[in-house]
Amino acid sequence: YHKCFVEKSIRTSRHADIVIANHALVMVNAAMAATLGQASDKNQPTRYIFDEGHHIFDAADSAFSAGLTAYETAEMRLWLRGNEDGRRWRKRGLQKRLGELIIDSEEALAALNTATDLARLLPGIGWKKRISENEPANEAEQFFCAVRNAVYQRANEPQSLYNLQVEVYPATQNMQEKAQKLKNLLNDLSVPLTKLATHLQGMIEEKADTLDSQTRNRIEGAYRGLMRRATGPLAAWQMMLDDLQQDSRDG
């Protein structure tokens, strides 16, 4: 579609008196309101009425949680760099989505190039095979190899066909070392992405009177995408990695 019907509906709902939506969308919007600085927005809902309330808990767990996994980090690489194998139907990278929007800013373009380049250090094509064979290709894959090795070392039945779960604390020395390296990488990656988000936010505020509605919507969508798909998860992952290097955790 020329415009995503879900995105169009969300945009229209901001000015509606009554909105009917599913639990997942309500929770995601509530979770992202704080991230995007919209918690005090007058257009935020003031009343919620839930039907089939037993779904709320799963929706809340999904919306307000984060997971540091090889899959999630590989998805971020794909979102930032786009299709790298020439076979997958998706996806456009950040260069194609943002390039023409920030073409007038050398600083923003430099940040975009830096972020795209650093994303190479996240898990890439074939990561599952490399991690299972303990042959990591970069810092991120090294961390997940360390996690996998620790799981098999601590599992009571490492040959089980079902999911393996073990206590993470205290983390092995190898996990802590690889966690610090990955944290440094994620911090380096978050810097240019934050610059991009700040630049887009500035464009919205400074050019509000001159932007046509389509361009403004594209910039707003790009800003929300950066916060939801990049800077938000990166901040959560860094907290997890920092926490992993402690001896134990309360709660």
Where do the protein language model's features map onto the residues?
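Short cysteine clusters
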Residues: C4
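Short acidic active-site motifs
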Residues: K8
